[in-house]
């Protein structure tokens, strides 16, 4: 099910609702196991706080007496402390004022930084809904780089976090909480930067160093459900996405398909093979793929060139 709107408001969710209503007609002892985070990129923005209450109210209405909300509350996850707080409170009282719960948590947990982080949440939520881009549990920040994570909004988010850090600069505990909560934004900046050929590589290096230092400082052990650690991510990022001495001879080459990729890859296939950018860890991140058959294509380099090896 998509996660940018409640279960009742999207097609896949409505299939679930229909099944839930069927079960509730014959049972008052139902358990729901609800997935509520991005398992591919746990340390990335996942602004779904606005749907929590309606979904929990739906469960209660349909005789759900046991609710396991799997939101992977690991260190560094997107506002994982507040997510656990709000879900717990709404389980006890599905009719509580959800916005008031958010304010209560932020005021107590972030102190004077709270107003800026509240703005951050609300602006990103609005941008997500306005973009029309779905939010799902195997997502990538790259999917949202023209929507809620577009360049203008990323600048706004950075400014809000800068103000939040400044507001609690004299309180070590509060400052570290803000810095920990900033990691998902910084991770998304790194992920998007690696897909932009004209991105500021020195800025990416500096941000990567900060991300590496902060994840170690705050004990962030994993970035996804595969348990890939931040340190490994940073090593691979430097190797794959930051400039190397060697340039690809196939950069910008014309691609002639003998066997076309699967339909879901064709939109980016011509560029993805020759843009000198590595694909990410999931298929939505610049993969070009064939299923059940071999890849066949011609790369036209435009002129004769000498080369010593081929890598993919």
Task: Describe each region flagged by the PLM.
Residues 3-115, 119:
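Structured mid-domain segments that build the active-site/substrate or prosthetic-cofactor binding neighborhood
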Residues 1-8, 282-286:
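Acidic/glycine-enriched edge-of-secondary-structure segments
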Residues 34, 62-63, 89-258:
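Catalytic domains of carbohydrate-active enzymes that cleave complex glycans
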């Amino acid at each position: 099910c998509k996660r940018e709107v409640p279960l009742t408001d999207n097609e896949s969710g409505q299939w679930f609702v229909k099944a839930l209503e069927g079960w509730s007609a014959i049972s008052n002892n139902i358990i729901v196991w609800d997935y509520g985070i991005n398992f591919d990129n746990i340390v990335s923005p996942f602004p779904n706080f606005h749907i929590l209450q309606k979904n929990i109210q739906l469960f209660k209405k349909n005789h759900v007496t046991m609710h396991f909300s799997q939101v992977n509350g690991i260190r560094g996850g997107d506002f994982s402390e507040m997510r656990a707080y709000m879900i717990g409170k709404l389980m006890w009282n599905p009719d509580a004022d959800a916005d008031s719960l958010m304010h209560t948590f932020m005021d107590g947990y972030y102190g004077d930084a709270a107003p800026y982080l509240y703005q951050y949440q609300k602006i990103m939520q609005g941008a997500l809904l306005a973009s029309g881009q779905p939010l799902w549990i195997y997502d990538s920040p790259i999917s949202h780089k023209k929507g809620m994570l577009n360049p203008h909004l990323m600048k706004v988010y950075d400014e809000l976090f800068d103000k939040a850090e400044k507001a609690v600069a004299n309180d070590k505990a509060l400052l570290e909480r803000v810095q920990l909560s900033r990691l998902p934004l910084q991770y998304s900046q790194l992920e998007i930067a690696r897909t932009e050929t004209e991105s500021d590589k020195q800025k990416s290096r500096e941000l990567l160093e900060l991300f590496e230092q902060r994840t170690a400082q705050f004990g962030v052990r994993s970035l996804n459900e595969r348990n890939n650690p931040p340190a490994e991510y940073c090593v691979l990022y430097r190797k794959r996405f930051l400039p190397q001495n060697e340039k690809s001879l196939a950069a910008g080459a014309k691609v002639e398909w003998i066997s076309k990729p699967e339909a879901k890859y064709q939109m980016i296939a011509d560029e993805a093979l020759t843009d000198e950018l590595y694909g990410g860890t999931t298929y939505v991140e610049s993969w070009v793929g064939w299923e059940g058959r071999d890849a066949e294509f011609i790369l036209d380099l435009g002129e004769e060139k000498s080369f010593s090896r081929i890598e993919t």
